[in-house]
Amino acid sequence: WHFNNGGKEISSGANAAMGLSLPLSIGAAVAEKKNQVLSVTGDGSIELNIQELKTISHYKLNIKTFVINNGGYVSMKKWQDNFFAGNRLDTEDLTGVGTLNFKKIAKAFDLKYELIKRESEINSKLSKIMSNESPYLVEVITDPNQKIYGKEF
């Protein structure tokens, strides 16, 4: 990663700590009040600390939370594909776990909301989001069958 103007990345060493993105982003926003903070998390991962959206909203922290929505728990899908011959249970809408409605969640926590469905929308929507100092919840729809790489299970 290359960051301009002294930007930094804060993450877990393995980039695999579910639920860590929101607490880290809050800490960064409080420590560096003048800077904008970007938080990237998954649609399953955010469920572990979703209450932190209230903290972000209450203190009007300049955090843009990007939720990568692939319609389920991709790491669990990978585990089930590798060790259970692709027999899936409770990893996506089709197997018993519904995806959250992030637009309603943003409204409930009094956050601005933006939806990115296509690559062609990214530049224009990012310009709008990044030019605003309000906290945002940004849902980014991705391919539910996208392969993930990294730690093997």
Describe these PLM feature segments.
Residues 1-153:
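Thiamine diphosphate
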